[in-house]
A protein has these predicted regions:
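Acidic, Mg2+-coordinating active-site environments of NTP-dependent enzymes
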Residues: 3-6, 15-25, 132-259
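Conserved dinucleotide-binding and phosphotransfer motif residues
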Residues: 8-9, 76-77, 246
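Short acidic/histidine-rich motifs immediately flanking catalytic phosphotransfer sites
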Residues: 10, 27, 101-105
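Acidic, glycine-centered active-site loop in nucleotide-sugar glycosyltransferases
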Residues: 24-27, 76-78
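N-terminal pre-Walker A segment at the start of P-loop NTPase domains
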Residues: 27-37
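Phosphate-binding loop of NTP-binding sites
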Residues: 37-167, 171, 175-183, 243
Length: 259
């Protein structure tokens, strides 16, 4: 496998099975105790070279769609790096981080977990300064036992937040609503509930598109989505809230969401 990787263009490899490289080996062979940990440590170092907004996206369902909507809302104003597909694991996240380049102005990283301690490890790699939690469901309930445990694990996404870090929570999710005032960071809620910071009103659909009025402290604006489903309204609200927080006007975010 290693010779094949080098032949395909790899300049160096981590290995935990070799004390030294074969005499005829090409490329750099780096002996480590744990290749997965070495990959994550290298990604964490690489991430530290970039002083840009990094948005982590997690939740039991809706992570990928929300990530795509956040990217759409921002891409008209920013050079965006986003997770491709669902590369959101302890292997996929580092590989996404390595795609960061100097041209990128913002990164949107999907972050998934299936066991206790995993989100904290991902947070140390990505070090998001903003994060979205879409909801708390039953995914991985076998490993984590209760939804409260799932919530606690998901919220480790803020472990490496800077003092100005911002968390965007689905205000329609009762488990997230219950903790929104006790978290050690700035919290913005979104949803259809009357007390959400970013709220959808007058939601309607014609079978091909979904339209609603976005109401937030900065004002109101009409939003049109080329998709159906009330869940997508929530995803779009999250995207608009993040966009405004990183300096993208709502009008610009609306254009991105429409397309």
């Amino acid at each position: 496998f290693i010779p094949a990787a080098i032949k395909s263009g790899a300049a160096a490899v981590f290995t935990q099975e070799h004390v030294e490289a074969p005499a005829d080996a090409a490329g750099a062979w780096i002996a480590v105790r744990d290749t997965a940990q070495a990959l994550q440590d290298l990604a964490a170092w690489y991430r530290s070279r970039f002083s840009i907004p990094v948005i982590g996206v997690t939740g039991s369902v809706g992570k990928t769609t929300t990530k795509e909507m956040v990217a759409a809302a921002l891409s008209g104003a920013k050079q965006v790096l986003k997770t491709e597909g669902n590369f959101n694991s302890q292997i996929g996240l580092p590989l996404t981080v390595f795609r960061l380049e100097s041209r990128h102005e913002i990164a949107i990283l999907e972050m998934g977990m299936s066991e206790i301690g995993e989100m904290g490890r991902l947070a140390r790699i990505a070090r998001p300064n903003r994060a979205v939690v879409t909801n708390i469901g039953l995914s991985h309930i076998e490993q984590l036992k209760t939804q409260e445990n799932i919530r606690a694990e998901k919220l480790h996404i803020i472990d490496c937040f800077p003092p100005e870090g911002a968390l965007f929570l689905n205000g329609d999710d009762p488990l997230l609503r219950a903790v929104r005032k006790s978290l050690p960071c700035r919290v913005t809620t979104y949803g259809t509930s009357a007390d959400c910071d970013f709220r959808a009103a007058d939601v309607e659909s014609d079978g091909e598109t979904t339209r609603f009025r976005l109401c937030c402290p900065e004002g109101e604006i009409g939003i049109e989505l080329p998709v159906l489903g009330i869940h997508n309204v929530g995803n779009a609200l999250a995207a608009a809230a993040v966009a405004l927080d990183v300096g993208v006007p709502l009008e610009k975010a609306r254009e991105g969401l429409k397309n």
